[in-house]
Amino acid sequence: MLGWTLVFLVVAVIAGLFGFTGIAGAAAGIAKIIFFLFIVLLVISLLINALKGKSPRL
């Protein structure tokens, strides 16, 4: 999921460099949404593992 965020971020940067501000804005917005979704899922996963008493896998 974090990989998709990076893909949309790269698309936004390239589109911004070429002057496609609409595409750049949309791609940056999508990247931001996916990034925050990733953070929320990470926190939920950490909380569930902490409540179950499992130690994190390294």
UniProtKB/Swiss-Prot annotation:
The chain crosses the membrane at residues 6-26, 28-48. The keyword ATP-binding does not apply. The keyword tRNA processing does not apply. Keywords: Cell membrane, Membrane, Transmembrane, Transmembrane helix. GO terms for cellular component: plasma membrane. Pfam families: DUF1328 (PF07043). It is a multi-pass membrane protein. It comes from the Bacteria. Belongs to the UPF0391 family. HAMAP family: UPF0391. NCBIfam families: PRK13682.1-3, PRK13682.1-4. This is UPF0391 membrane protein Shew185_1413. It comes from Shewanella baltica (strain OS185).
